[in-house]
């Protein structure tokens, strides 16, 4: 499966010891059971969808803007935690290193309210399509199981370009599957008609 990215707009939190700089920073990367309109179809992530990926103990990175050279933490180093919270949503925290200029800059931007969104990169193991009032047949995609989680990121801008490209690609595959299914049904109808004509002729 192709790697995809999604962004959630919400509060990026931080915890401080006394009046000093935050000792831990984090946010919500994904909200479950909430329908998102991606412009080509609707999408919802089911509660429990992240359990499979998190059970693998994969080394998930916390990056700034999904940039590999702007690493904020990683789970194997115990400088980042990625987990499902009490609401079933995907949450993450990371421990800033204030000797690192990137960390200092990101934390200050979060404290000022300049960064309020989080994103995550993932692949899908199990999904299904259903009817959507807005997009019609197979217009709603339900993500049931996430295969892998690669990184979580506080982001300056939502990953709109990546998300739109993902949505276009997924919609194209969906449309192709619909055409194949329609062709199969058409062929099946033709076969039934031939059989009926043959029976009528023999009769």
Positions of predicted regions on the chain:
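Signature of dsDNA virion morphogenesis modules
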Residues: 1-177
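Terminal short linear interaction segments
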Residues: 175-203
């Amino acid at each position: 499966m192709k790697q995809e990215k999604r962004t959630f707009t919400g509060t990026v939190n931080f915890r401080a010891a006394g009046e000093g700089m935050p000792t831990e920073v984090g946010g919500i990367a994904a909200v479950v059971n909430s329908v998102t309109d991606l412009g080509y179809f609707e999408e919802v992530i089911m509660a429990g969808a992240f359990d499979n990926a998190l059970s693998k103990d994969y080394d998930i990175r916390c990056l700034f803007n999904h940039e590999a050279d702007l690493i904020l933490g990683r789970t194997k180093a115990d400088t980042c935690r990625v987990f499902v919270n009490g609401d079933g949503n995907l949450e993450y925290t990371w421990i800033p290193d204030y000797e690192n200029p990137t960390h200092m800059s990101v934390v200050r931007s979060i404290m000022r309210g300049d960064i309020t969104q989080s994103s995550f990169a993932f692949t899908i193991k199990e999904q299904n399509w259903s009817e959507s009032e807005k997009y019609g047949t197979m217009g709603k995609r339900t993500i049931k199981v996430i295969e892998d989680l690669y990184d979580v990121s506080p982001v300056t801008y939502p990953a709109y370009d990546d998300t739109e490209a993902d949505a276009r690609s997924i919609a194209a595959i969906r449309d192709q599957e619909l055409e194949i299914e329609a062709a199969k049904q058409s062929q099946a109808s033709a076969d039934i008609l031939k059989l009926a004509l043959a029976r009528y002729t023999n009769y």
